[in-house]
């Protein structure tokens, strides 16, 4: 490393930043506003800000605008707040470089509320965005704008229109691959590509930049341009391309490294990839240190490190000496280096990707060049563009077929869950040891080859003395296996109940000491796509690939729409998570929502059963007792005839009451069977018409959990209900304030965890 000072400097920088994070010193710079101003903004949501338009995009419901050099106007004073993302109520005629004055509701960007949730706060903090402005109304705008940046936007829009005409239904995929634009990309398509482990081809990366940049450079050389003009033109073109396609961290990493490589070529210097990678990383981290913990940064740089540092060593360990065997083994090195990152941020790793990338990567250049050729020809003739893009569209059909194969298989991904920091460090310790073993084998093979050439020994005699190398290979394999097992290790032994923050709704995850898993409800009236953005990430982060049962208390949408979405994903092969049973309330009259859920379960291969009063569902040391509805329940009043369950483990009891009201509580009291409980999932999101005083006097919950959104039209939770709970001696926990609430017990002692600590 002494011969590569940039690498040493980068290593020390990363080590220092990592140490700061481990010591509790955050890499995020923090809120740029004074505390008193923050408090006043929270109390008076109407705010006025002024900033320069950097970019904008039109969505289905609003116009999203990114502002830079922004300041807040508060009590005739100006407070700089760096960058802000605003959502305008109506579409405005804006251009990059304009300075605009807008009024709206200014809110801090929040972090995730649930395990596995996307960390918006960190993502935007890397980009110096700490506030969103909702319901924004444009007050003023300047006439001056950046003609250069507007031109780039217009070029991008023209390219998008050409692809729409030339590629038809495949246009969103080509827009993602060639323009870095995923705005119109179907979410299910993204899920299929992710499941198959080929989602990376939809992002602008080093592969794209090298194909386009070097292709342009070589074309210009063949046209008669010298090294300097061809190189400088290629440099400029790739820089503009990187800016036009959005300037993501992976794009700018690839563009910067291309600039360094081309600079070395035109000046006659030797290009060192590790030094270029180090310089690029330092440039990004100096501008925003928080990128060190950004998934895009870690995966982009991790892939290059895997190919540059680990590939040859892993090939040596695997005995891969020929080109085709190295081509098979090298991607494994990349996967090994990025494995902890994938698990930390996504909870799963595509196993199918090991195989499918061998088929996809050699051909993705055809797709990219086909898209680019269509863009160029489309300026003159759309029919010609349709013709030239046809082979690329055929390849996309092949990719979709591969994705469907992966989706049908339950083994295509490993859901290992989110590892702890110590697990990641131990894994990398094992991996580094394995790489040293690979380096040793590589050197020994080189020495033996040299000896055999000098002494004219036969290859058989050289290999005969390789027993030591075989032993090292076996040891390395064991080390890797142990490291991976440690990475996916999740200690059991206790009961864990996670009340997810689903906004206005319910979603509860139960993990038993014997590693059985259940979902109780899963729906929301305030959050869309709950299955994709909440339930799936939460399950993956906990390492759950199998749900023993999904309980449905009743069929209101705020309890079932996420579950239905999850079942549909299972049926379509968009997730490898599977379930055993869907347990529905035993109603005589089954509403449409009940039947639709049952049908979705059938398509997903999930068995359907019903449960009513008196049913016991044992699962090892844990049991579910159904207290309601009665076996002759009609199901006409879905709230009052919701499924009520008691979860028991040792001396611990927890009561789940769905959306029942005072009438059903009276019936439960009259029927007997209720007893003291340690934890109560408060009925109907804290409604004033539920959780009566008499009911609380009987069950005496030590902890009560209320699940609802911070702002809702129902007035949940009702102040009267909260007062009754406190009067009963209950510790009241709210998902709306602290995100997911976790109840963990060994059957005797109780521990409460809040996902959001602030």
Predicted regions mapped to residue ranges:
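Hydrophobic alpha-helical segments of integral membrane proteins
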Residues: 148-166, 170-173, 178-181, 189, ...
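Feature for secretory/organellar precursors and membrane-associated catalytic proteins
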Residues: 54-57, 296, 502
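Membrane-interface helix/helix-cap signal primarily in integral membrane proteins
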Residues: 13-16, 20-200, 457, 532-537, ...
């Amino acid at each position: 490393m002494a011969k590569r000072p940039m690498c040493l400097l980068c290593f020390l920088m990363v080590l220092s930043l990592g140490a700061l994070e481990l010591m509790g010193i955050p890499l995020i710079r923090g809120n740029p506003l004074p505390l008193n101003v923050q408090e006043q903004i929270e109390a008076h949501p109407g705010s006025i800000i002024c900033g320069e338009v950097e970019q904008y995009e039109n969505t289905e419901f609003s116009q999203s605008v990114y502002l830079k050099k922004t300041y807040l106007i508060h009590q005739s004073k100006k407070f700089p707040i760096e960058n802000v993302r605003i959502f305008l109520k109506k579409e405005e005629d804006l251009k990059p470089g304009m300075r605009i004055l807008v009024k709206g509701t200014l809110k801090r960007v929040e972090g995730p509320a649930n395990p596995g949730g996307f960390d918006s706060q960190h993502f935007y903090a890397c980009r110096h965005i700490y506030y969103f402005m909702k319901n924004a109304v444009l007050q003023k705008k300047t006439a001056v704008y950046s003609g250069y940046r507007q031109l780039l936007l217009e070029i991008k829009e023209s390219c998008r229109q050409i692809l729409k005409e030339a590629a038809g239904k495949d246009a969103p995929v080509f827009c993602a691959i060639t323009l870095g634009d995923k705005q119109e990309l179907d979410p299910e398509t993204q899920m299929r590509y992710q499941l198959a482990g080929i989602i990376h081809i939809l992002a602008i990366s080093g592969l794209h930049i090298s194909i386009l940049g070097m292709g342009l450079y070589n074309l210009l050389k063949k046209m008669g341009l010298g090294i300097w003009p061809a190189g400088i033109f290629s440099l400029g073109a790739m820089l503009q391309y990187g800016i036009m396609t959005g300037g993501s961290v992976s794009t700018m990493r690839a563009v910067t490294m291309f600039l360094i490589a081309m600079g070395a070529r035109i000046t006659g210097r030797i290009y060192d990839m590790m030094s270029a990678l180090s310089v690029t990383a330092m440039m990004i981290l100096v501008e925003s240190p928080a990128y060190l913990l950004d998934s895009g940064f870690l995966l982009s740089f991790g892939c290059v490190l895997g190919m540059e540092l680990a590939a040859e060593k892993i090939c040596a360990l695997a005995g891969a000496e020929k080109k085709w065997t190295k081509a098979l083994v090298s991607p494994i090195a990349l996967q090994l280096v990025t494995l902890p990152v994938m698990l930390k941020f996504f909870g799963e790793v595509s196993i199918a990707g090991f195989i499918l990338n061998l088929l996809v990567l050699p051909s993705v250049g055809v797709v990219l060049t086909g898209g680019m050729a269509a863009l160029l020809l489309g300026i003159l003739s759309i029919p010609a563009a349709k013709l030239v893009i046809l082979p690329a569209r055929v390849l996309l059909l092949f990719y979709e077929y591969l994705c469907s194969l992966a989706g049908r298989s339950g083994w295509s991904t490993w859901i290992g869950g989110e590892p702890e920091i110590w697990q990641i460090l131990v894994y990398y310790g094992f991996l580094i040891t394995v790489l040293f073993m690979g380096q040793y084998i590589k050197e020994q093979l080189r020495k033996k080859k040299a000896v055999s050439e000098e002494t004219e020994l036969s290859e058989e005699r050289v290999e005969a003395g390789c027993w030591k190398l075989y032993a090292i290979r076996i040891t390395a394999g064991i080390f890797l296996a142990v490291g991976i097992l440690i990475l996916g290790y999740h200690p059991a032994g206790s009961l864990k109940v996670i009340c997810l923050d689903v906004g206005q709704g319910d979603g509860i995850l139960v993990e038993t000491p014997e590693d059985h898993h259940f979902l109780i409800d899963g729906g929301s009236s305030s959050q869309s796509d709950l299955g994709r953005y909440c339930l799936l990430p939460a399950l993956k982060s906990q390492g759950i690939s199998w749900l023993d049962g999904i309980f449905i208390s009743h069929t209101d949408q705020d309890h079932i729409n996420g579950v239905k979405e999850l079942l549909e994903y299972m049926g379509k092969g968009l997730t490898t998570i599977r379930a055993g049973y869907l347990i529905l309330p035993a109603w005589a009259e089954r509403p449409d929502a009940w039947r639709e859920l049952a049908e979705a379960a059938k398509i997903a291969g999930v068995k359907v059963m019903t449960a009513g009063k008196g049913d016991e569902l044992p699962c090892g040391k844990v049991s579910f007792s159904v207290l309601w509805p009665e076996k002759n329940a009609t199901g006409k009043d879905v709230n009052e005839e919701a499924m009520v369950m008691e979860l028991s483990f040792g001396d611990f009891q927890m009561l789940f009451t769905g959306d029942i009201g005072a009438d059903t509580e009276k019936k439960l009291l009259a029927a007997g069977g209720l007893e003291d409980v340690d934890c109560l999932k408060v009925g109907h999101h804290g409604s004033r018409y539920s959780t009566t005083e008499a009911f609380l006097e009987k069950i005496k919950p030590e902890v009560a959990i209320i699940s609802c959104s911070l702002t809702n039209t129902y007035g949940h939770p009702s102040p009267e209900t909260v007062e009754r709970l406190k009067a009963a001696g209950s510790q009241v926990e709210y998902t709306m304030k602290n995100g997911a609430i976790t109840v963990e017990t060994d059957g005797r002692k109780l521990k409460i965890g809040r996902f959001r600590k602030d």
